Swiss-Prot record:
Compartment(s) where it occurs, according to its Swiss-Prot or TrEMBL record: Membrane
Chain spans, region Disordered: 95-197
Protein name in the entry: Uncharacterized protein CXorf66 homolog
Polar residues composition-biased segments: 95-106
Annotated membrane topology: Single-pass type I membrane protein
Glycosylation sites: 24
Residues of the signal peptide: 1-17
Biased composition (Low complexity): 144-158
Organism expressing this protein natively: Bos taurus
Compositionally biased intervals (Basic residues): 169-185
GO cellular component, one term: membrane
Keywords from the UniProt entry: Glycoprotein, Membrane, Signal, Transmembrane, Transmembrane helix
Length: 361
């Protein structure tokens, strides 16, 4: 607008200047050729100013109209977007109001029987389910935990042995058990240390017979000299360089380096009270014709042969007592055949004292 005002003022000023020149020329009747040229130049200037002012005015008007049109379009788009949002919110509010009024319809319109029946059915279906839903979620949380971690069955009570005995069995080493087996015990407590593994002889039952109890207090008296002490000493010296294996439960083995000296057995009621070494006696009846054909089993140990002669009508009982039951003890009773000789072959499994008692009645 300021530019338009300036152009108008400029045109007015130029026109006034031209009027003044014309008045001066009329006053002076004589005009020269130079003045005529000046008048033409001024006219050109006037025309140029008019053209420039017209172009400026038209440009300004066009720009203003463009700005107004753009601003109006943007405002219309903004108002249209606002109207759409308002319509969406109004529709949502109307739908929520309709649902809320439908839920409260039994209180407002009690006169409609159809609405009352539908509402009563909905209340019956939703009413009892609401208190049940809370424990159902809790049950869902509890059930998988109970399924994942089943209750372990209670361990059965041990009746076989008392707690102190079980602790002794756990903490006892094979050496200590073997040493305690050699200790003196009363007759009621004497039992095999390994009752689970019974020792069975490989010989037929026809060659075996039960041993009869001997009522002698000591198998070898103190005053009588030991006849074959040298053979026993040789055996003990030889045993020092041998490693004997002791049978143990669950595959345990004990290597014994030094054997104990010879101990005299003290027998009472077919059981030994001193030595409880496990042995397997084997008895074969060998006659004079079959002495050369004695069956020699394949043992890992050396077989010891003991010979005894028996007198007529005076039977003797030679029994090797060890850590075994009564059924495993074998003896030889020579009532009728006293002239024969007997070979006793023992399969030695652990450290034991081998000795020979000869007694002349």
């Amino acid at each position: 607008m300021n530019l338009f005002i300036y152009v108008l003022l400029l045109s007015i000023w130029t026109s006034s200047c031209l009027d003044r020149n014309e008045s001066n020329g009329s006053a002076t009747a004589v005009t020269t050729h130079a003045e005529f040229k000046q008048t033409k130049l001024q006219e050109l200037r006037r025309r140029l100013l008019i053209i420039v002012i017209g172009t400026l005015i038209t440009g300004y008007m066009v720009s203003c109209t463009c700005l107004l049109h753009y601003s109006c379009d943007s405002e219309e788009a903004h108002t249209a977007a606002k109207d759409k949002k308002e319509d969406i919110t109004i529709k949502a509010s109307r739908s929520s109001k309709i649902s809320f009024t439908d839920s409260k319809s039994p209180t407002a319109g009690l006169g409609d029987p159809e609405r009352q029946s539908v509402v009563s059915r909905i209340d019956k279906s939703s009413g009892p389910s609401s208190p049940r839903k809370v424990p159902s979620s809790a049950e869902k949380l509890v059930r998988p935990s109970s399924q994942k971690k089943p209750s372990k069955p209670s361990a059965p009570k041990k009746v076989l042995g008392s707690p102190p005995q079980e602790k002794l069995h756990r903490t006892r080493s094979p050496k200590k058990a073997h040493r305690q087996a050699h200790a003196h015990k009363p007759v009621s407590q004497v039992s095999p240390s390994y009752p689970e593994k019974a020792i069975k002889s490989t010989w037929p039952p026809s060659l075996q017979c039960r041993a009869k109890p001997t009522k002698t207090p000591l198998p070898y008296p103190k005053n009588q000299s030991f006849p074959e002490q040298s053979s026993v000493d040789k055996l003990t010296k030889r045993q020092r360089y041998l490693k004997l294996k002791c049978p143990a439960s669950a595959g345990r083995a004990e290597i014994l380096s030094r054997p104990h000296p010879v101990k005299f057995c003290r027998c009472y009621k077919e059981k030994c009270l001193v030595c409880r070494a496990v042995s397997e006696p084997f008895i074969t009846h060998v006659s004079d014709a079959n002495k050369k054909h004695v069956p020699v089993p394949l043992f890992s140990r050396e077989l010891k042969h003991f010979y005894k002669s028996y007198k007529k009508k005076q039977p003797k009982y030679n029994t090797l007592y060890g850590n075994m039951s009564d059924s495993d003890i074998t003896t030889y009773n020579s009532d009728g055949e006293s002239d024969r000789e007997v070979i006793i072959m023992c399969n030695i499994k652990c450290k034991e004292d081998i000795y020979k008692n000869s007694r002349n009645n």
